[in-house]
């Protein structure tokens, strides 16, 4: 069974834990209890493949920012979550993305931009803005509601698909037959 290490990042109060718990336990947590770090595991079937999701739900509060490098380093893919009723959380996405690129030392990291709380009538982040940001990053954008479950599976499953594409790209680039160990051609005897 293939395992995928997913990390959920975003500002405090955007619903990272609510999204994760909705996926794992199928219920909505409506009280806000700031997370330091929680880990969840769930076996799911995505596109006919049984896989194990190892999800790290992270702290959004600034006082825990020193921990971010470590969990960004270990994650294969990241859900970058903002709340559609919180413009600051949307602006913060760029800071998270820059930190991810720095920690991973790469511009090519599997990510999905997630606009949470789409069930709320008080929107301050326009869907078009979010689509444009995701397009500029070259990543998918999905609106979700942890409360109604809208888009929750889609967000996590899309991230798994992004990781699969990334793995295949890495595999194909290292398996083109021209480069072997340390950049030298291989000879099988």
From Swiss-Prot:
Source species of the chain: Pongo abelii (Sumatran orangutan)
Residues where lipid is bound covalently (S-farnesyl cysteine): 186
One cellular-component annotation, GO: Golgi membrane
Membrane topology note: Lipid-anchor
Gene Ontology molecular function terms on file: G protein activity; GTP binding; GTPase activity
Assembly and binders: Interacts (active GTP-bound form preferentially) with RGS14. Interacts (active GTP-bound form) with RASSF7. Interacts (active GTP-bound form) with both SHOC2 and PP1c (all isoforms) to form a tertiary complex; SHOC2 and PP1c preferably bind M-Ras/MRAS, but they also bind K-Ras/KRAS, N-Ras/NRAS and H-Ras/HRAS.
Record protein name field: GTPase NRas
SMART domains, alphabetized: RAB, RAS, RHO
Residues where Phosphoserine is found: 89
Sorted UniProt keywords: Acetylation, Cell membrane, Golgi apparatus, GTP-binding, Hydrolase, Isopeptide bond, Lipoprotein, Membrane, Methylation, Nucleotide-binding, Palmitate, Phosphoprotein, Prenylation, Proto-oncogene, Ubl conjugation
Entry-linked PANTHER family: RAS, DI-RAS, AND RHEB FAMILY MEMBERS OF SMALL GTPASE SUPERFAMILY
Catalytic reactions on record: GTP + H2O = GDP + phosphate + H(+)
Annotated propeptide span(s): 187-189
């Amino acid at each position: 069974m293939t395992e995928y290490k997913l990390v959920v990042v975003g500002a405090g109060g955007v619903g990272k834990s609510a999204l994760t718990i909705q996926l794992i336990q199928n219920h909505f947590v409506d009280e806000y209890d700031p997370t330091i770090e929680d880990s969840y595991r769930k076996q799911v079937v995505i596109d006919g493949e049984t896989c194990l999701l190892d999800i790290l739900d992270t702290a959004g509060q600034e006082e825990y920012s020193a921990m971010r490098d470590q969990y960004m380093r270990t994650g294969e893919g990241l859900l970058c979550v903002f709340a559609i009723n919180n413009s600051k959380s949307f602006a913060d996405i760029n800071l998270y993305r820059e930190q991810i690129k720095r920690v991973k030392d790469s511009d090519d990291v599997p990510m999905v931009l997630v606009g949470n709380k789409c069930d709320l009538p008080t929107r301050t982040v326009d869907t078009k803005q979010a689509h444009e940001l995701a397009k500029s990053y070259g990543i998918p954008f999905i609106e979700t509601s942890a409360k109604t479950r809208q888009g929750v599976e889609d967000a996590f499953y899309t991230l798994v698909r992004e990781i699969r594409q990334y793995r295949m790209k890495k595999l194909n680039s290292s398996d083109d037959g021209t480069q072997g160990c340390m950049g030298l051609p291989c000879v099988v005897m």
